[in-house]
Amino acid sequence: MAANYWASTQRRHWLFTREKLAEIREIFREGDKVAHSQFPLPDQRLLNIYFSQQLIKLGKRMSTRQQALATAQVYIKRFYTKNEIRHTNPYLVLTTAFYLACKMEECPQHIRFVVGEARSLWPEFITPDVSKLGECEFSLISEMNSQLIVHHPYRTLSELQPELSLTSDEVALAWSVINDHYLTDLPLLYAPHVIAVMAIIVAVVFKPNSGNFHGSAAPVLAGAMRDGGMNVLAALGDRTGSGPPLKIQKLINWLAESEVDIKGVIECTQELVSLYEVWEQYSEKTCKELLGRMVKAKNLDK
């Protein structure tokens, strides 16, 4: 997907303000207070963690690339800016987003194979009728106005690696931070290059002495960011800090000379700190039970 981000539908149609996202969700709440009362759901970020983990399980069964999983997560976010989650079967939406993302990221899977693997994971929520996924795919494409190309931060990370002399460990940790940002609203709020710069800063500043980073960065970053995050944010806001290690100083200098949205980078970092704090409350069992009760009670699995 090498198209120009600046001319993309992602930039023109799928970036929101925090206020706009809050307004959309409030409209959903006001539009169906009964459903919100009857079927309480966890914090959106906890749901995002659950959805991400389910996508990873599905992807592993088909050896799917990370970028396809990331695209699927963005599709899910976009879909739920147009639809109240309590009126949908999230497992069908998740499976359909995965199926569509694989096609768009040029690693397509046969529809029957996807349905079969999804049924093996969530037999009580996915029917063997492949036409259900086909119908949901049509709805997903329609709600996104056929705007299916997604630009990700991974590309910017790869481009900046030589310029910023990033080590393989720093790149791996930054990659994991990018994975984690899909668990927040950040893909709907900021450009991919802003996310990539945030991930690089976090990786360079908080990188442990050694580590093997796969999937999420939460285990190695949560405590460090909570304890030291504000100092780094102050240095970034100041742009002239004196005393940081040479590599961090070089990064701050590069940032000051670039045209990157510093305020956006800081806000993205704060959002990541907040994610890692709420992650401590995550319970896969709770998410599964609450979603399952909702889907079954409303017959959304039919």
Swiss-Prot record:
GO biological process: positive regulation of transcription by RNA polymerase II
Domain Cyclin N-terminal: 53-142
Keyword Kinase: no
Keywords: Activator, Cyclin, Nucleus, Repressor, Transcription, Transcription regulation
Matches recorded under CDD domains: CYCLIN_CCNC_rpt1
GO MF term (any one): cyclin-dependent protein serine/threonine kinase regulator activity
GO cellular component terms listed in the entry, alphabetical order: mediator complex; nucleus
Name of this chain's protein: RNA polymerase II holoenzyme cyclin-like subunit
Gene that encodes the chain: ssn8
